[in-house]
């Protein structure tokens, strides 16, 4: 019997850091770039993977988030990026990026947590700031929708995990001590 079981090795070396579902496609980040995986399910062509971005690899496994049909992430060079299916990877201009990039705790990029607050069209990145130690202590956020679209915000708040409203009525963030906090309540 015919089988569609296969493996696909992404060319170019590096390691796979994370993947996120966008519509019917998978976005797959390596530490070097971004790939789009499309499922065909046919003998001989089960999946197709196309490289859509280079030098925009993901800094950590939780440093990417999808809002609507657009992915947002932090790359290994501490730059913010966006990608919408069918488009191109775009660096996002950030007037407060230097503070983030200069103070991200050394070798702690794996701790960055990207999340959304869809009600306000916001993506946020919680990260370990070297001025505070080695646990997530600060955030940087971008309004991607609404009248504030393009505006960046930053603040001090310890969150190592965050989930948008949906499973519950409000977004919920958790500190490194395990304390949950309801946001926007």
State where each predicted segment sits.
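A short helix->beta-strand "capping" segment at the edge of beta-propeller domains
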Residues: 2-11
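Beta-sheet-dominated scaffold domains
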Residues: 11-185
């Amino acid at each position: 019997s015919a089988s569609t079981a296969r493996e696909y090795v992404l060319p170019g070396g590096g390691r796979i850091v994370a993947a996120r579902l966008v519509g019917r496609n998978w976005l797959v980040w390596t530490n070097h770039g971004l790939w789009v995986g499309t499922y065909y399910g046919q003998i001989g062509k089960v999946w197709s993977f196309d490289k859509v971005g280079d030098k925009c690899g993901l800094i950590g496994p939780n440093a990417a988030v999808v809002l609507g049909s657009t992915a947002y992430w932090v790359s290994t060079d501490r730059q913010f990026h966006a990608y919408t299916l069918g488009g191109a990877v775009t660096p996002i201009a950030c007037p407060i990026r230097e503070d983030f990039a200069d103070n991200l705790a050394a070798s702690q990029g794996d701790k960055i947590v990207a999340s959304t607050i869809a009600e306000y069209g916001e993506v946020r990145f919680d990260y370990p700031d070297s001025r505070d130690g080695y646990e997530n202590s600060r955030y940087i956020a971008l309004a991607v929708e609404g009248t504030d679209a393009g505006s960046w915000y930053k603040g001090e708040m310890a969150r190592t995990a965050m989930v948008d409203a949906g499973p519950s009525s409000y977004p919920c963030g958790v500190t490194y001590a395990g304390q949950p906090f309801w946001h926007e309540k």
